[in-house]
UniProtKB/Swiss-Prot annotation:
Name of the protein in question: Large ribosomal subunit protein uL11
Molecular function terms from GO: large ribosomal subunit rRNA binding; structural constituent of ribosome
Keyword Transmembrane helix: no
Keywords, ordered alphabetically: Methylation, Ribonucleoprotein, Ribosomal protein, RNA-binding, rRNA-binding
Functional description taken from the UniProt entry: Forms part of the ribosomal stalk which helps the ribosome interact with GTP-bound translation factors.
PTM summary: One or more lysine residues are methylated.
Subunit organization: Part of the ribosomal stalk of the 50S ribosomal subunit. Interacts with L10 and the large rRNA to form the base of the stalk. L10 forms an elongated spine to which L12 dimers bind in a sequential fashion forming a multimeric L10(L12)X complex.
Organism: Buchnera aphidicola subsp. Baizongia pistaciae (strain Bp)
Source taxonomy: Bacteria, Pseudomonadati, Pseudomonadota, Gammaproteobacteria, Enterobacterales
GO cellular component, one term: cytosolic large ribosomal subunit
Family statement drawn from the similarity comment of this UniProt entry: Belongs to the universal ribosomal protein uL11 family.
UniProt-listed GO biological process terms: translation
PANTHER family, A to Z: 60S RIBOSOMAL PROTEIN L12, LARGE RIBOSOMAL SUBUNIT PROTEIN UL11M
Amino acid sequence: MAKTIQAYIKLQVSAGTANPSPPIGPALGQKGINIMEFCKAFNTRTNNLEKGLPIPTIITVYSDKSFSFITKTPPASVLLKKAAGITKGSSKPNQNKVGTITMQQILDIAQIKKIDMTGSNIDNISKSIIGTANSIGLIIAEGTNK
């Protein structure tokens, strides 16, 4: 007999550094999940990623208190800020530009995001990432990466 799903929990958890403190502990604890078991499994699955990178995670909680989880790719805005070498986006992206990113860097990010995004091809995904870059105040430079 198949397990019945009790709930879905969506969290952004830092890669390789999951611990029982908020927001993980309270979110999982109220559903009756073994928090340390999740933290160990998550850290094992994300140990090949850069520590501290926020990873969107969807946790499926079953009625017998077991769980499974899916990790997604980091948000495009995080990847863009990392590629541009900035820590935060512009508060007025149309007026103040805070960094520059090349088209090659956008294509590299599109390749990473291709796994999760529903865009039919790399061009559509790149356009979406360009929109995100504009919304955080980045200038798109022509040319290749360094």
